[in-house]
Amino acid sequence: MAKTKLSTGVEVEMREPKVRDMRIVATYKDEVEKELNLIGNLTGLTADEIDELSLKDYGLLQKELTSFLS
């Protein structure tokens, strides 16, 4: 589990992905949709909450996701 502090001061926890998470997002054709849904699944953030993130904060979550996948 990793914690990321957003610019709003909110701390978001992201759990490590499991094979089941990859199976769920494999149904999406678009890579952006895959990533958005995977981040949502791992953090518990809703699609609306993710849509309202600044690009800087979203980038922090992308970086955390990448660290799990590499």
Where are these regions (language model features)?
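Short, surface-exposed, charged amphipathic helix/loop patches that serve as local interaction elements
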Residues: 1-70
